Design a protein with these regions (language model features):
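Catalytic core of pol beta-like nucleotidyltransferases
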Residues: 1-26, 32-38, 49-106
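Short, conserved active-site loops that position catalytic residues or coordinate cofactors/metal ions
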Residues: 40-42
Length: 106
């Protein structure tokens, strides 16, 4: 179960991602399991609409902007670059919080 704090963050994350070249995003890790602490970061697995046009500066800027919006450290992991050894754990924990063109995400 997502904590009230994480539930309150999701609409802000969704609004931000809608302005960026992100196709879909999943919350994973301690926040998706309801086990976060005040020191926990927010782990996001994202798929970009056109990843070959995003520079490291673009991605770094997205991280900084998200951190300002939600007041927490953010780890932004590209789905295509997720290492195979981590895939099973991430897939087990992940909760879809954004998909381009969808107006309601459960």
């Amino acid at each position: 179960m997502l904590s009230a704090e994480v539930q309150a963050m999701i609409p802000r994350i969704q609004a931000f991602l809608a302005t960026r070249p992100v196709e879909r995003a999943y919350l994973f890790g301690s926040c998706s399991r309801g086990e976060e602490t005040p020191e926990s970061d927010v782990d996001l697995l994202v798929s970009y609409t056109d990843s070959d046009k995003l520079s490291l500066m673009d991605i770094g800027g997205m991280i900084v902007d998200l951190q300002k919006i939600i007041h927490r450290p953010v780890d932004l992991i590209e789905d295509a670059s997720l290492m195979p050894f981590a895939r099973q754990t991430v897939d087990h924990d992940k909760i879809k919080i954004y998909e381009r063109g969808e107006t309601h995400i459960e």
